[in-house]
Amino acid sequence: MQMMRWGMPSPAFVLKGKKTDKGVTNVRNTTSPHWRRWLGPAHRCVVPFTRFSEYQTIKGEKPKSVWFAPTGPQETLFFAGIWTNWTSVRKLKEGETTDNLFAFLTVEPNGVVAPIHPKAMPVILRSPEALAHWLDAPVEEALKLQRPFPDDGLKIVDGPG
């Protein structure tokens, strides 16, 4: 296991006129040339989690975090991710740094996440076979895992635990 900084390098068009690159935390369009270079096995990672949150926005109200957890007892799941070592300016006060950066792949939300966050949800892996497939399979095969997690695999919970 290795600590990394969340947020892959932003596409060049996003950075025009900016002094910093805050990074991209969620990658959905895996056909983009910007992301394709990091989709091979050497740049894939998994991120363990027991809970995650999405912001729920209701018109006229402050966004609030809604937490999701696996339905299995004490279950750890994994986000499918990509990573790279990159030199950039993330924050002006830090200046230029070289970091291992990562982001999650995302997909259309399942029936549990969609009412809260209709845009997307992370790609979630559960089985040892899915983990191995994501980490080692050829790109076209690995990307078949970029699909919504089954509705019965997640539940809404109170807080981060």
Label every PLM stretch briefly.
Residues 1-45, 69, 74, 80, ...:
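Short, His- and charge-rich active-site/binding loops that engage polyanionic ligands
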Residues 35-38, 57-58, 93, 113-116:
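Short histidine-centered beta-strand/loop micro-motifs
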Residues 48-49:
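A secondary-structure boundary/capping signal
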Residues 52-54, 75, 85-86, 131:
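Short, catalytically relevant binding-site loops at active-site mouths
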Residues 97, 105-161:
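C-terminal accessory segment of soluble enzyme catalytic cores
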